[in-house]
């Protein structure tokens, strides 16, 4: 059965030598806030990333920033709240943020969604009990001890944990494994006060379409790049009734949005494509807003369509430090400004690096394609056609929360990792 598989990995390295809560009022539209953060994150990335395929998980990044927010104080907390748009200490926010895991983790209809965090703490660093309690209840968080003086061992542990989370089908690792010995604590304090912590967040998703793309219908068709050149790529096909809508950008250019639902209807993949082949995808990327995405909910209409969607697989590795700084989160990276007194009594904790890795694959199930299908595809019914044969934007969105699990662009489906 056709399915979409995705996973993301977010890593923060903290350099230790270690913000009062300004009570924020929860917005009446948490969905809009979540969407706004995701769009802002993506648009900031498009300003710095090259014109290649791109994918990011706003849900995963916001989960990590939320964990930081639990231990932030002063202006550090203000910046995190301002960027996310909400206060994770609000129980209503916590209930909403826990929905993705609760809604889908136990689905029996071809869906699997797993969210997990791990906070790797330098041996010898003592966490505050209150933070430990809150962290272990936040997004399936594990607290794990590691000696950062051995980089190879540390990297191996981070990768092993992330690999375990991406492969575990039935459960998530949520536990506390803090083991300190006096010798390890001594060693930790001898590192010129340079203690480390690492935060790893994973989001894994596998989903089956409500209506499958038959592997035997896939054929090689041209995909046109932004410069006008073409390449032949495996193009999936199906004819069915789907939700589709036509919208207009502030610059008056039109674009089309197609919705592909999953079996239990909790998630949907939205594909946005400029209607005019001469309109570059960058125009859509620059002008899309959270409000526009919200209007898609009411602007889509059920229509019989012939759908052509390229099979694609991509991976992005992103340095989030400049991106978050552009979004207004700067104190966490400053040794003098970062205020994480809610995490530990140890002075001088700040974030030195922040990386994000995301992967996605859209394909049909099956092991080999059939040939001689071009004539069949070219003689379909007279239904309207949606053909993603040029660069397009995609969003994997959860309906109940508005959370953008993934947002990205396909500019070259033939460029696969």
Curated annotation (Swiss-Prot):
One GO cellular component term noted in the UniProt record for this chain: extracellular space
Matching Pfam families: Serpin
Keywords assigned by UniProt, alphabetized: Glycoprotein, Protease inhibitor, Secreted, Serine protease inhibitor, Signal
SMART domains per record: SERPIN
Family membership: Belongs to the serpin family.
The protein's role, per its UniProt record: Probable serine protease inhibitor.
Descriptive protein name: Probable serpin E3
Organism: Danio rerio
Gene: serpine3
């Amino acid at each position: 059965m056709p399915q979409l598989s995705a996973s993301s990995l977010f890593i923060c390295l903290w350099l230790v030598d270690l913000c009062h809560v300004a009570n924020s009022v929860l917005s009446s539209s948490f969905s809009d806030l979540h969407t706004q953060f995701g769009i802002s994150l993506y648009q900031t990335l498009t300003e710095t990333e090259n014109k290649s395929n791109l994918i990011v998980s706003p849900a995963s990044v916001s989960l990590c920033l939320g964990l930081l927010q639990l231990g932030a104080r002063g202006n550090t907390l203000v910046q995190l709240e301002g960027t996310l748009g909400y206060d994770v200490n609000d129980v209503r926010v916590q209930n909403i943020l826990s929905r993705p895991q609760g809604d889908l983790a136990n689905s029996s209809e071809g869906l699997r969604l797993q969210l997990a965090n791990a906070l790797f703490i330098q041996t010898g660093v003592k966490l505050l009990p209150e933070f430990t309690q809150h962290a272990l209840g936040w997004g399936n968080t594990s607290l794990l001890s590691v000696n950062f003086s051995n980089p190879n061992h540390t990297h191996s542990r981070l990768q092993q944990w992330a690999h375990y989370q991406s492969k575990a089908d039935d459960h998530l690792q949520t536990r506390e494994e803090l083991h300190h010995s006096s010798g390890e604590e001594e060693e930790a304090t001898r590192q010129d006060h340079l203690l480390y912590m690492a935060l790893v967040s994973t989001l894994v998703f596998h989903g089956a379409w409500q209506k499958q793309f038959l592997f035997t219908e896939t054929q090689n068709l041209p995909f046109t790049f932004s410069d006008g050149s073409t390449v032949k790529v495996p193009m999936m096909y199906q004819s069915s009734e789907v939700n589709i809508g036509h919208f207009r950008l502030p610059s008056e250019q039109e674009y089309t949005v197609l919705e592909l639902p999953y079996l239990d209807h909790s998630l949907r993949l939205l594909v946005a494509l400029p209607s005019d082949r001469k309109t570059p995808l960058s125009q859509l990327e620059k002008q899309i807003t959270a409000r526009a995405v919200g209007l898609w909910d009411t602007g889509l209409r059920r229509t019989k369509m012939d759908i052509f969607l390229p099979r694609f697989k991509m991976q992005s590795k992103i340095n989030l430090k400049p991106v978050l700084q552009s979004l207004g989160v700067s104190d966490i990276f400053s040794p003098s400004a970062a205020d994480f007194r809610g995490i530990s009594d140890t002075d001088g904790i700040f974030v030195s690096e922040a990386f994000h890795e995301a992967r996605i694959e859209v394909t049909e199930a099956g092991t080999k394609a059939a040939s001689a299908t071009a004539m069949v595809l070219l003689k379909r019914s007279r239904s309207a056609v949606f053909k993603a044969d040029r660069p397009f934007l995609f969003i994997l969105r959860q309906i109940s929360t508005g959370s953008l699990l993934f947002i990205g662009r396909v500019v070259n489906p033939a460029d696969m990792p």
